[in-house]
Amino acid sequence: MNLQALIEDIRQQVLPFYDQGRVADYIPALASVPPHQFGIAIHTLDGREHACGDADTPFSIQSISKAFMLALTLQADGEQLWRHVGKEPSGNPFNSLVQLEYEHGIPRNPFINAGALVVTDRAIGHFGDAHARLLAWLREETGNAGLMADQAIAASERAHGDRNAALAHFMKSYGNLGHPVETVLDQYFHNCSIAMSCRELARAGLFLANHGLSPQTGTQYLSRSQAKQVNAVMLTCGTYDAAGEFAYRVGLPVKSGVGGGLLAVIPGKMAIAAWSPQLDARGNSVLGLEALDRFTTRTGLSIF
């Protein structure tokens, strides 16, 4: 199968979907991103790379960082982590307070904002500077020593992060955050503000397709069981309240971010990253979903 020709053809098929979504505007620094961009990149376990479009343009990975933070923290915390955060889909918006109150400060899963704040808090307990640890890992996996958080986006998120602050204070009141709220928020916002390209993101995510083992560095980041767990939570919770649609149309573990990125995993084969900044009503990339749908439909590569 000629994957390069396939993704180039898919790119042409999805470009007409421009303007069927809108760029995230609740974070002002994201609102200024030019909307008509699309990139896709594939990294396979046997070392092949395919990319087209704007695959080398860095973008804010936003909530995709939560998948990497979950992996880092699960490696350090083990099963203890699941006493502080659940594994179930929420069915609510990613920044909802309602469910958190009903469930006494235990977030439903690690990928809604409340859950990611708890994971960050647990990571701080193990690494001190969890953001620095995440950056070091991503730099090693991508080979980009200059990979950084976008400070303008981090500052913009902090200035407009009252809902996240409310979530953190609420969980703190239930004893489910062990560190100062400001410390947790600062590291969380900086994680979300990391800028990566599709090529880099697919390369960094490849360990999830390889039972937790990085093909690039030979590092075993997760046990086989833990890699299965992360992929499972990505499948059921990784695209917020659109997880059912993604499972139906794409059939892969996927993590999305409001920067317009998507990271998809085909266990035993490859990782795929797609990016286009215009989002649907649920906060997922319009063109990214269309591209992944076409890719799995035409290749037959899904977990189902």
Swiss-Prot record:
GO BP term (any one): glutamate biosynthetic process
Keyword Transport (UniProt): no
Chemical reaction(s) catalysed: L-glutamine + H2O = L-glutamate + NH4(+)
Sites where the protein binds substrate: S63, N113, E157, N164, Y188, Y240, V258
Domain of life: Bacteria
Keywords on record: Hydrolase
GO MF entry, a single one: glutaminase activity
Alphabetized SUPFAM superfamilies for the sequence: beta-lactamase/transpeptidase-like
Enzyme Commission identifier(s): 3.5.1.2
InterPro entries hit by this protein: Beta-lactam/transpept-like, Glutaminase
Top-rank EC class of the record's enzyme: hydrolase
UniProt keyword annotation of Hydrolase present: yes
Pfam families for this protein: Glutaminase
UniProt record similarity statement: Belongs to the glutaminase family.
Subunit text: Homotetramer.
HAMAP family (alphabetical): Glutaminase
Protein name (database record): Glutaminase
Species of origin: Chromobacterium violaceum (strain ATCC 12472 / DSM 30191 / JCM 1249 / CCUG 213 / NBRC 12614 / NCIMB 9131 / NCTC 9757 / MK)
Taxonomic path: Bacteria, Pseudomonadati, Pseudomonadota, Betaproteobacteria, Neisseriales
Annotated gene: glsA
